[in-house]
């Protein structure tokens, strides 16, 4: 692998994943990953542009940012690209009225959306709400439509909480795709449109940006597909086999966000 100086040259903007990079979640709350609060502060004091890019779909953007602020992070709602607000914009633009299969924690994001006589299904990480009854109702809504539209907030396979690995929305999305014979539209990582909207928000071109995440496919692979560079942290859902993934090779592997920021601040101006 090329030297760090070569791999990080020309970086002007940084996209940061949240869960597994900044903090770990659990049923009882969230805890900051060691060194990450200081790492974000150092990044924001540097000339680099910073944007937070998350697939979080169990909390509203306001609640998510509030939790992070309580942990000590310097972050505001305006600095976060998240799938629920982006999905609401799409629904309004296209005149779509969703049947929602989502977590109660994110439902407030959809308060302004017309849900009468649904003409699409929106699915997110619904947690305990992923019952047979709820999945079957979403299936029925899709099958009743002449042109079924399924929108998924991300398509992650799993994520990590302090209690262990948790099934993410991707498996349920795939079940509905298979049962209905359709292809879902993904709003969130690794969708190219999602990454591009985050880059537009900080005015940085893909070749000048680097993604830092814990998901080898969604964060690293997705960013690289858009022309960005990407680092994987060995926190969150990272697994040792990720460094030998058959399809995705990160531009570098670091122990945590603090190490990534050390390297960025050391080499990006060189």
UniProtKB/Swiss-Prot annotation:
<dbReference type="GO" id="GO:0042803">
    <property type="term" value="F:protein homodimerization activity"/>
</dbReference>
<feature type="binding site">
    <location>
        <begin position="17"/>
        <end position="19"/>
    </location>
    <ligand>
        <name>substrate</name>
    </ligand>
</feature>
<feature type="binding site">
    <location>
        <position position="189"/>
    </location>
    <ligand>
        <name>substrate</name>
    </ligand>
</feature>
<feature type="binding site">
    <location>
        <position position="214"/>
    </location>
    <ligand>
        <name>Mg(2+)</name>
    </ligand>
</feature>
<keyword id="KW-0479">Metal-binding</keyword>
<dbReference type="Pfam" id="PF13344">
    <property type="entry name" value="Hydrolase_6"/>
</dbReference>
<keyword id="KW-0378">Hydrolase</keyword>
<dbReference type="InterPro" id="IPR006355">
    <property type="entry name" value="LHPP/HDHD2"/>
</dbReference>
<dbReference type="GO" id="GO:0016607">
    <property type="term" value="C:nuclear speck"/>
</dbReference>
<dbReference type="GO" id="GO:0005829">
    <property type="term" value="C:cytosol"/>
</dbReference>
<dbReference type="InterPro" id="IPR023214">
    <property type="entry name" value="HAD_sf"/>
</dbReference>
<dbReference type="GO" id="GO:0004427">
    <property type="term" value="F:inorganic diphosphate phosphatase activity"/>
</dbReference>
<comment type="subunit">
    <text>Homodimer.</text>
</comment>
<dbReference type="InterPro" id="IPR036412">
    <property type="entry name" value="HAD-like_sf"/>
</dbReference>
<comment type="function">
    <text>Phosphatase that hydrolyzes imidodiphosphate, 3-phosphohistidine and 6-phospholysine. Has broad substrate specificity and can also hydrolyze inorganic diphosphate, but with lower efficiency.</text>
</comment>
<keyword id="KW-0539">Nucleus</keyword>
<feature type="binding site">
    <location>
        <position position="19"/>
    </location>
    <ligand>
        <name>Mg(2+)</name>
    </ligand>
</feature>
<dbReference type="InterPro" id="IPR006357">
    <property type="entry name" value="HAD-SF_hydro_IIA"/>
</dbReference>
<comment type="similarity">
    <text>Belongs to the HAD-like hydrolase superfamily.</text>
</comment>
<dbReference type="GO" id="GO:0006796">
    <property type="term" value="P:phosphate-containing compound metabolic process"/>
</dbReference>
<protein>
    <recommendedName>
        <fullName>Phospholysine phosphohistidine inorganic pyrophosphate phosphatase</fullName>
        <ecNumber>3.1.3.-</ecNumber>
        <ecNumber>3.6.1.1</ecNumber>
    </recommendedName>
</protein>
<feature type="binding site">
    <location>
        <position position="17"/>
    </location>
    <ligand>
        <name>Mg(2+)</name>
    </ligand>
</feature>
<dbReference type="GO" id="GO:0046872">
    <property type="term" value="F:metal ion binding"/>
</dbReference>
<dbReference type="Pfam" id="PF13242">
    <property type="entry name" value="Hydrolase_like"/>
</dbReference>
<feature type="binding site">
    <location>
        <begin position="54"/>
        <end position="55"/>
    </location>
    <ligand>
        <name>substrate</name>
    </ligand>
</feature>
<dbReference type="GO" id="GO:0016791">
    <property type="term" value="F:phosphatase activity"/>
</dbReference>
<keyword id="KW-0460">Magnesium</keyword>
<dbReference type="GO" id="GO:0005634">
    <property type="term" value="C:nucleus"/>
</dbReference>
<keyword id="KW-0963">Cytoplasm</keyword>
